[in-house]
Amino acid sequence: MAKETFKREKPHVNIGTIGHVDHGKTTLTAAITDILSKKGLAQAKKYDEIDGAPEEKERGITINTAHVEYETANRHYAHVDCPGHADYVKNMITGAAQMDGAILVVAASDGPMPQTKEHILLAAQVGVPKMVVFLNKVDLVDDEELLELVEIEVREELTKRGFDGDNTPIIKGSATGALAGEEKWVKEIENLMDAVDSYIPLPPRPVDLPFLMSVEDVFSITGRGTVATGRIERGRIKVGEPVEIVGLQESPLNSTVTGVEMFRKLLDEGEAGDNAGLLLRGVEKTQIRRGMVIVKPGSITPHTDFKGEVYVLSKDEGGRHTPFFNKYRPQFYFRTTDVTGEVELNAGTEMVMPGDNTNLTVKLIQPIAMEKGLKFAIREGGRTVGAGQVTEILK
């Protein structure tokens, strides 16, 4: 009887295919699963299974996304592929499918097209750290010089958006050829996965980041003090550690955690993913409210003015029926609370239509603990009309 092989938990990375319509994103996804399935590292998924992605709702926004998973020798990947361009825009802006890296698919026969460029820009805006390029359909291009020109153009486009265009790996291949089992092209898919393994960085584990917990509720326990409850988003907290309570006021409150509670049990520490109650020394119940965050001192600051990349829900998604203009004043929902803010559209933008994505500037009436990449919803009277994330902090 053979011994069970020792399974080491491989590190997990979220990845996705991006690029222009019909450049071969879905065929490539199918080819990756097909080739890795022969090594026992994936379940093969056919083109139609990926392309017929079911609709999902993320914060009221309808997105078609296909999820496949596979492994390489070193890592476990969750891979997203979206059938339509609008699905990508929504996915990236809402962070419905968090991407630690991306495979940019460019057809060698076309070169970078408008959506190629838009996806690169969006990836930069939403903080995708690195991408690997798959130059697809090279079997349809006889001219070596043309391939070189396309490669130069892709590298320039990446550099323009803040990626390291000069050092980004570009793999030349044919997804269709690989799917048909042609050895030459199968090898290029293997090269692609090697490049993804080595060039896309491992994401930091949430527990290793500075402590942050969003306050959902506050109550006082007679004789013990004030308890704030919420979900620990990142980091860990131990009894006796100092914290700051940030947001909805100009300057943070300082306190010390004197107890960590989960499911009515007292613990020594809480960590990312836990729903916990923190007992806070020297803080009155009236000083804390939902929407504040409890953090490692100095790790995050409150701000009112920021730029954001936003997707505005279409009428069919339950969004607005009419466009909005400069000085629009909705509520911005961050983590656990709504704050009113005034919108300033970019110069040259008259209005924003339902179904659009745009970059805009917001001035909140109260400060929120904020950092680049923070997600928010735009609401009117409790109804979600948009979603976005902070791309730059202004004040």
UniProtKB/Swiss-Prot annotation:
It is found in: Cytoplasm. Residues 81-84 are annotated as: G3. Residues 19-26 are annotated as: G1. Its EC number is 3.6.5.3. Residues 136-139 are annotated as: G4. Residues 60-64 are annotated as: G2. The lineage of its organism: Bacteria, Pseudomonadati, Bacteroidota, Chitinophagia, Chitinophagales. This is Elongation factor Tu. It comes from the Bacteria. It catalyses: GTP + H2O = GDP + phosphate + H(+). One of its GO terms (cellular component) is cytosol.
